Amino acid sequence: MIAYPCPMLKYVNYDIVFQEFPDEVTLAINLSCCPNGCIGCHSAYLRGDVGEELTWERLLALTESYAGNITCVSLMGGDNDPASVLELLARLKKHYAGKLKTGWYSGRTWEPSAESLRESLDYLKLGPYLAALGPLNSRDTNQRFYRVNPKGELEDETFRFWK
């Protein structure tokens, strides 16, 4: 757990990835200030208060710089300010009016309301990393991958990661 407040969303880096969300070419933006402190986390550097503020303008600029090359934008982390994550992704989803999907990878176990899900997300990955249970490609994992249907309901598709 971090011992200092992180009053805003900050991004450290980003990359184009092909396996975070099945069948998507994703702009994955890594957010810092992670409060979860998962032992064995592959991105422990994201626990610190580092990076630049992720504003709507910056998110839009990053997204537009990859226009035509991506099918999805995902925020990786942001558990220090889930409301801001959902707000930014809702704006992005509305701005692109179905032409670009959105996803969120959260280390928490809670689920946003159906309305928030419907307005903000196409995909949601939930759950802290627990080394004894393995990552998403392990059948024993506690983490879950969901597709958000048009009603805002979560459809568990974790099996798509299993080997």
Where are these regions (language model features)?
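Core AdoMet radical
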Residues: 42-54, 68-83, 98-111, 123-148
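N-terminal [4Fe-4S]-dependent radical SAM core
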Residues: 1-30, 35, 43-48
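A short, N-terminal amphipathic alpha-helix
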Residues: 58-66
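Charged phosphate-binding loop/patch that engages nucleotide di/tri-phosphates or the phosphate backbone
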Residues: 149-163
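Short cysteine-rich clusters marking metal-coordination/redox-active sites
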Residues: 38
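Flexible, charged surface loops at secondary-structure boundaries
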Residues: 22-23, 65-69, 119
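Catalytic cores of alpha/beta
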Residues: 112-118
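Conserved nucleotide-cofactor-binding alpha/beta core module
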Residues: 82, 86-93
